[in-house]
């Protein structure tokens, strides 16, 4: 019985021998489609090839693509754990032809692989074709020898695929496996096709038409093939299972869950173990591909998945965080096929642990609220949307988690009321997911790239070069020429200008043409390989002009220093904090370095000092930086750090900086990076951290300066310290102690002043004048000059003690504003509300209202001259 890993290898090996380029899985975050939340099909990484926007590197390809369906249009989250074949994460095996072979060879490959390589019984297979696709039906008869009874014609869109309202489209042919008559269900197209007897295992898409906007459908000059076979589905068939969760991978994950929880995967507990196993896969792969749990976009979907699994761990009685202890089992099972899992194991374990610990603090209380809210609901009842919203807002329960929780009781949630209560949060959760760094290059640039080819970047060697204008773009449209005064985008055949990428800002400088220098405001990367200059033209410019492009060398040098320092910081963070640290983003330019990284809490002063000291020690080594071109896998196996979720080409640039502080024979920092960097570590000169802060849950940010900017910062700090020392007439080393003493003195004096004001207020009119009687109610009403809201509370409490029964109304005036405090003794709260009395006083004084309870309330007003009017309003209410 083949393992899942062996099945994947057999598929890829077969197509590799059939002259297909075996392509590694793309990251789960789409690189070329900002409209997609996650890669959800095998063809997504090839979308621009199918649309003609990109030229394929090879006319045939095959892959096992990581996919996630847990958000947006394609969302399987609710069903996971309760069905045999729903997953949030799955692998899609696929073979692709880009204008090369078509239907006959696609059908031949599929039939050969299934029957000759996988040795599936031919009589267990049947196929569907689009009802008008006679060609496909005839080919199935010719190649597989299938009769008409096993070639089912389907007239619906299930067997016709399209990319959208317009674009490539074509009929499909789906291959089904018959699990046998002992399982209920009929063949596709029959009334009982939804049964589980006949399971689709492979879909062949014959992309032969183009759908035009007017409704017309024309034939493509070079039809293509896109196929998809779910690895988990074919593994179940080949391992003699009817349920995906019974294949070897899930058996291992579920066994680990059973061992750690002590609860068997049987009966009502089985879905929980399945959810945990499935969600562990999607969570771990998303983390490995650079997604972090957050409250928006992709990060929020990840958090939903993680928390759903954590609730099921809670249902199984797990008393301690569970998910992070299962991660090593997943890495053992899938790490060979996906090395990024191994590289990210420390990050995965730490993030899962932190997220579960954070959620467990509210999970129990939230479940208690849910149990209380559903206690009196009968099966078929509806949980009110307000409670569901409270669970979300207060306890961190995503809506689908609440729905999952009440499902076991036969209940549903009033989602309309929930949506109305949390529209703002819902928008944040569902919208604003950005694409990758390129955010889907405009079609115009892909067209230009086809004509002009990739930019020849020579910026590693020089900051000045001569080039020829290959394209000019104005407001998104390609033009032949542009006039002085316009701001345009200019493409040269070769350039020394670095285009913004990997967090490094694009170069600025000048382009000289016709004896005039035009300012280059920015340089951006388009269509993957084009360095596009945004230029403020000082002279006319046309395609074909020869120009001299000169980078702002000073800005380039400071940017290089900041970028190299960021690499050193990354290495130092690993040494000081641990291997779980992963880069989450960076921005380096001519001003400073900003580095975002995964870590669970604020860094201590000692940790920051150690990081800063390490980086400066490597700078002082003043050793040459080394760069080398290598294959990505070769570089990673050699120890180079790759960014999680980044997709690399066939060759990568490997940058080595400094010597290890523990072993000089080893390097301090080795990373894959295409940016510009210093020639020697000593060129950085000096490194100084200026801030460290949190930017999201589990993500911290360090900002730092290098070189002259760092020196000026330290001089400024020294100047401030010297000025304070002169002011305090104390040595610089003792300034901090002196400031601490002054702060302590101020707090003590403020406390003494508040007490003095309180005593003055009480002594200035308390017992001597006594309360007045207002319609039978004792009232102490005072205007207290110079007393703020904080002091008023204590004064009101003291006055209240003097009354057996009554009301205290105080207005404190300070800096032209007024503070109102009202207190009511317990016996009168049924008759008078302090909140109502305070509100009346504040409104009479020109304010908006007050807050509080029946026995005590406070508010504020903008005009202290109306203090007596405020007290009069209180008296009026008491008088009835």
UniProtKB/Swiss-Prot annotation:
Q: Which reaction does it catalyse?
A: tRNA(Ala) + L-alanine + ATP = L-alanyl-tRNA(Ala) + AMP + diphosphate
Taxonomically, the superkingdom here is Bacteria
Subcellular location as annotated: Cytoplasm
The positions annotated for binding Zn(2+) are 563, 567, 673, 677
Q: Which InterPro entries match?
A: aa-tRNA-synth_II/BPL/LPL, Ala-tRNA-lgiase_IIc, Ala-tRNA-ligase_IIc_anticod-bd, Ala-tRNA-synth_IIc_core, Ala-tRNA-synth_IIc_N, Ala-tRNA_ligase, Ala_tRNA_ligase_euk/bac, DHHA1_dom
Cofactor names from the entry are: Zn(2+)
Q: How is the cofactor bound?
A: Binds 1 zinc ion per subunit.
Family annotation (Gene3D superfamilies): 2.40.30.130, 3.10.310.40, 3.30.54.20, 6.10.250.550, Bira Bifunctional Protein, Domain 2 (3.30.930.10), Threonyl-trna Synthetase, Chain A, domain 2 (3.30.980.10)
Question: Recorded E.C. number(s)?
Answer: 6.1.1.7
Q: Does the keyword Coiled coil apply?
A: no
From the Swiss-Prot or TrEMBL record, what is one GO molecular function term? tRNA binding
Look up the record and give one Gene Ontology term from the biological process aspect.
Answer: negative regulation of DNA-templated transcription
Q: Provide this UniProt record's keywords sorted from A to Z.
A: Aminoacyl-tRNA synthetase, ATP-binding, Cytoplasm, Ligase, Metal-binding, Nucleotide-binding, Protein biosynthesis, RNA-binding, tRNA-binding, Zinc
Tell me yes or no: is tRNA-binding among this UniProt entry's keywords.
Answer: yes
Checking Pfam families in the record gives:
DHHA1, tRNA-synt_2c, tRNA_SAD
Any GO CC annotation of this UniProt entry: cytosol
Q: Which family does it belong to?
A: Belongs to the class-II aminoacyl-tRNA synthetase family.
Protein task: Catalyzes the attachment of alanine to tRNA(Ala) in a two-step reaction: alanine is first activated by ATP to form Ala-AMP and then transferred to the acceptor end of tRNA(Ala). Also edits incorrectly charged Ser-tRNA(Ala) and Gly-tRNA(Ala) via its editing domain.
The written remark on domains in the entry is: Consists of three domains; the N-terminal catalytic domain, the editing domain and the C-terminal C-Ala domain. The editing domain removes incorrectly charged amino acids, while the C-Ala domain, along with tRNA(Ala), serves as a bridge to cooperatively bring together the editing and aminoacylation centers thus stimulating deacylation of misacylated tRNAs.
| PANTHER family (alphabetical) | ALANINE--TRNA LIGASE, CYTOPLASMIC, ALANYL-TRNA SYNTHETASE
Q: What is this protein called?
A: Alanine--tRNA ligase
According to its UniProt entry, this protein's organism is Caulobacter vibrioides (strain ATCC 19089 / CIP 103742 / CB 15) (Caulobacter crescentus)
Q: What gene is it encoded by?
A: alaS
């Amino acid at each position: 019985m083949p393992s899942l890993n062996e099945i994947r290898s057999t598929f890829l090996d077969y197509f590799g021998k059939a002259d297909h380029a075996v392509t590694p899985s793309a990251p789960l975050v789409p690189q070329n489609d900002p409209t997609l939340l996650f890669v959800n099909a095998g063809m997504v990484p090839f979308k621009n090839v199918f649309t003609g926007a990109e030229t394929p590197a090879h006319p045939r390809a095959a892959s096992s693509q990581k996919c996630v369906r847990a958000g947006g249009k394609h969302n399987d989250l609710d069903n996971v754990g309760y069905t045999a074949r729903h997953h949030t994460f799955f692998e899609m095996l696929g073979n692709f032809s880009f204008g090369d072979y078509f239907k006959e060879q696609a059908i031949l490959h599929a039939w050969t692989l299934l029957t000759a390589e996988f040795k599936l019984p031919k009589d267990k297979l049947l196929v569907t074709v689009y009802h008008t696709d006679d060609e496909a039906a005839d080919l199935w008869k010719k190649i597989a020898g299938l009769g008409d009874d096993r070639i089912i014609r389907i007239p619906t869109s299930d067997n016709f695929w399209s990319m959208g309202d317009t674009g490539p489209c074509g009929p499909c042919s789906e291959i089904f496996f018959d699990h046998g008559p002992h399982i209920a269900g009929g063949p596709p197209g029959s009334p009982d096709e939804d049964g589980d007897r006949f399971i689709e295992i492979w879909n062949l898409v014959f992309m032969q038409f183009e759908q035009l906007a007017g409704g017309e459908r024309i034939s493509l000059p070079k039809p293509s093939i896109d196929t998809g076979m779910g690895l988990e589905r074919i593994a179940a068939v080949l391992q003699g299972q009817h349920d995906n969760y019974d294949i070897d991978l899930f058996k291992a994950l579920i066994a680990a869950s059973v061992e750690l929880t002590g609860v068997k995967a049987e009966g009502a507990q089985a879905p929980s173990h399945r959810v945990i196993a499935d969600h562990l896969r999607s969570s771990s792969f998303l983390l490995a591909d650079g997604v972090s749990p957050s409250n928006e976009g992709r990060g929020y979907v990840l958090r939903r998945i993680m928390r759903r699994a954590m609730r099921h761990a809670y249902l199984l009685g797990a008393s301690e965080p569970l998910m992070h202890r299962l991660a090593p089992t997943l890495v053992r099972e899938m790490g060979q096929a996906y090395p990024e899992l191994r590289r990210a194991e420390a990050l995965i374990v730490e993030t899962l642990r932190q997220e579960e610990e954070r959620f467990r603090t509210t999970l129990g209380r939230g479940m208690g609220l849910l149990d209380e809210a559903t206690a009196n609901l009968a099966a078929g009842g509806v949980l009110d949307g307000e409670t569901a919203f409270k669970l979300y807002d207060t306890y961190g329960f995503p809506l689908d988690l609440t729905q999952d929780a009440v499902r076991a009781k036969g209940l549903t949630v009033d989602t309309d009321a929930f949506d109305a209560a949390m529209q703002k949060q819902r928008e944040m959760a569902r919208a604003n997911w950005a694409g990758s760094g390129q955010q889907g290059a405009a079609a115009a640039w892909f067209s230009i790239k086809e004509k002009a080819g990739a930019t020849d970047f020579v910026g590693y060697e020089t900051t000045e070069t001569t080039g020829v204008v290959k394209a000019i773009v104005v407001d998104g449209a390609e033009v032949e020429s542009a006039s002085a005064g316009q701001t345009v985008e200019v493409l040269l055949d070769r350039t020394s200008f670095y285009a913004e990428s990997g967090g490094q800002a694009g170069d600025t400088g000048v382009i000289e043409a016709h004896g005039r220098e035009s300012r280059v405001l920015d340089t951006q990367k388009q269509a993957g390989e084009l360095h596009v200059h945004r230029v403020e033209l000082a002279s006319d410019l046309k395609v074909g002009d020869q120009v001299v492009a000169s980078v702002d060398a000073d800005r380039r040098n400071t940017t290089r220093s900041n970028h190299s320092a960021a690499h050193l910081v990354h290495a130092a963070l690993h040494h000081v904090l641990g291997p779980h640290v992963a880069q989450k983003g960076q921005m380096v330019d001519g001003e400073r370095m900003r580095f975002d990284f995964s870590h669970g809490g604020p860094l201590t002063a000692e940790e920051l000092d150690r990081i800063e000291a390490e980086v400066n020690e490597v700078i002082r080594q003043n050793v040459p930086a080394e760069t080398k071109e290598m294959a990505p896998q070769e570089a990673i196996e050699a120890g180079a750090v790759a960014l999680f979720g980044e997709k690399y080409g066939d060759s990568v640039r490997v940058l080595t900086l400094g010597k290890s502080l523990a072993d000089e024979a080893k390097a301090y920092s080795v990373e894959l990076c295409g940016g510009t960097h210093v020639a020697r570590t000593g060129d950085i000169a000096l490194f100084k951290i200026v801030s460290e802060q949190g930017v999201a849950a589990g993500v911290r940010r360090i900002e730092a300066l290098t070189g002259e900017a760092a020196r000026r910062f330290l001089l400024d700090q020294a100047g401030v310290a010297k000025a304070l020392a002169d002011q305090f007439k104390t040595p610089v080393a003792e300034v901090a102690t002196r400031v601490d003493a002054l702060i302590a003195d101020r707090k003590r004096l403020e406390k003494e002043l508040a007490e003095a004001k309180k005593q003055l207020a009480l002594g200035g009119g308390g017992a001597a004048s006594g309360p007045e009687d207002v319609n039978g109610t004792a009232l102490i009403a005072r205007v207290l000059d110079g007393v703020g809201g904080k002091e008023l509370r204590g004064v009101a409490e003291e006055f209240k003690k003097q009354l057996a029964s009554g009301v205290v109304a105080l207005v404190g005036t300070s800096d032209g504003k007024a503070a109102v405090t009202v207190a009511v003794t317990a016996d009168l709260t049924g008759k008078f509300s302090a909140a109502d009395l305070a509100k009346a006083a504040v409104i009479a004084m020109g304010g908006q209202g007050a807050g509080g309870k029946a026995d005590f309330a406070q508010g504020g007003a903008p005009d202290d001259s109306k203090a007596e009017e405020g007290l009069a309003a209180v008296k009026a209410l008491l008088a009835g």
